[in-house]
Each structure stands twice: as C-alpha cells, then as structure tokens.
C-alpha cells in the first residue's frame, strides 16, 4: 500500500479555514510559519514508514524541498512542473518589462500576481515594491528559466533525479505530476535522453490525462502521409 502524504507548509489546524472563506488567501506567508507546521507532513511520513507503509510524499514544487523530503524515506517524491512553469514564465515577463522600463506598474501587477499565487500573503497588498522585485528576481534566478537548465521548466526534474542518484534510497521513484501543454511531454522526453540521466529512466513515473499522453503518439505529417497513402490506394497517380 502506498499512502499519499502532502507537504503542509504554513497551513495548520488553526488557519486552514482561511482557505475556505472570503478571498481564500492565507494570512501567513509560505516562509513565515512555525517549524512544527512545516514538519507536520515529514513526521507523518516517517511514522507511516515506521509502520511499514510506503509513502508518496507530494506537493513538491521547488528543488529545495527534496533533501528534507528524502529524509522521510518516501517511496515516491514529486516534481510539479506545469503550473510552476507557467507562473515562472509570467513572473519573468513582468520582471523583464520592469527592468526595461522601470515602470512601477509592472511591479504592482507582480505584487497582485504573487498574492494570487501565494508567494505573498493576503496581508501583503501594500508590500514594498522593492520586496516584490527581489522575490521576482530570486524566483527567476533560482528556477533558471533564462538558462539551459530551466528554459523548458524541467529544472526541478533534473535536480530531483540528481538527488535520487546520490541518495541511498534505491527504491524511491520520482513522479512528474500533471503534465500538459504542447511542449511539456516532448521536453520531458528529450530530458530523459540526455546523457546525464540515461541511468535514471527506471526511476521516473509520469502522471497525466490518458488523452494527453496518447496525443504524443501522433504528429502532423502522419496526416500528410496518410493522405498520400489513401489516395494512392484509391488509384490516384
């Protein structure tokens, strides 16, 4: 049996109701919570492991989560890539626009976006724009969207595969979660042929809609050649 255990971050029994009421935003920033709240999921995962259960330790969005997650000895760790890549692309676009124009309206848009995506809390509506710029810059730099490592949104996957290779958890696998979009599977497919990861293909699991995975059996020129074949079979020369 594999039991799914989520990271809880700053969410606890006292504030979880905030996610269900009003604007559904949390009043605590993701990085300003209590240690006991951050490690709630880790403790649960370890207890389950001690009782003989396998754990799928989920809600892993950033590479920095992986080292601590592996200490819980999970059967699965995760890389959430789809929404993360979209968010990174949007932040990078607004930050680039600000850096070219120094128009604070771009930072104001970033601030609203970061509140909506929980980089900032619901109480940060008037957060200093210099803080907003710093958070945006650090996010873009860490996720390496302007570099070969992360231009495809796969920086977290690369990191997690390296962590698995260098761990002593031979049974642990990486789930790449909820991929979709015209480039996500093709980019992951190319990543798995990179020489660095040729020994890790049996450590990765993909989760997605069957219809999305199935569409990657097709290509535009299949139609082109089927047209030729069918018309040739119909007697056309």
Question: What are the residue ranges of the model-derived segments?
Answer:
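Conserved phosphate-chemistry cores used by DNA topoisomerases
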Residues: 1, 197-198, 208-216
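Active-site entrance/lid segments in N-terminal catalytic domains of soluble metabolic enzymes
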Residues: 1-31
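Short acidic, S/G/P-rich loop/turn micro-motifs used as interaction or catalytic elements
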Residues: 8-17, 84-85, 180-186, 211-214
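Catalytic alpha/beta core domains of metabolic enzymes, predominantly
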Residues: 21-46, 53-200
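C-terminal helical cap(s) of enzyme catalytic domains, especially alpha/beta-barrels
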Residues: 89-104, 193-194, 213-237
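Terminal-region recognition feature
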Residues: 179-181, 206-209, 219-220, 236
């Amino acid at each position: 049996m594999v039991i799914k255990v989520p990271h809880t971050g700053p969410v606890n029994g006292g504030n979880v109701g905030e996610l269900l009421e009003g604007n559904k935003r949390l009043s605590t920033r993701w990085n300003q919570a209590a240690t006991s709240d951050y490690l709630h999921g880790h403790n649960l995962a370890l207890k389950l492991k001690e009782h003989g259960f396998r754990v799928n330790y989920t809600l892993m969005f950033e590479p920095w989560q992986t080292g601590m997650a592996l200490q819980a000895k999970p059967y699965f760790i995760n890389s959430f890539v789809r929404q993360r890549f979209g968010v990174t692309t949007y932040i990078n676009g607004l930050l680039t626009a600000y850096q070219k124009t120094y128009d604070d309206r771009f930072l104001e848009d970033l601030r609203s976006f970061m509140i909506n995506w929980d980089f900032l809390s619901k109480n940060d509506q008037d957060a200093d724009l210099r803080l907003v710029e710093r958070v945006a810059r650090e996010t873009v730099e860490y996720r390496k969207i302007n570099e070969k490592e992360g231009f495809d949104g796969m920086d977290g996957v690369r990191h997690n595969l390296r962590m698995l290779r260098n761990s002593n958890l031979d049974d642990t696998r990486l789930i790449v979660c909820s991929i979709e979009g015209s480039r996500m599977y093709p980019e992951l497919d190319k990543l798995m042929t990179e020489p660095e990861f040729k020994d890790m293909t049996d450590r990765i699991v993909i989760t997605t809609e069957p219809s999305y995975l199935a569409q990657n059996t097709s290509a535009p020129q299949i139609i082109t050649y089927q047209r030729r074949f069918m018309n040739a079979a119909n007697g056309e020369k």
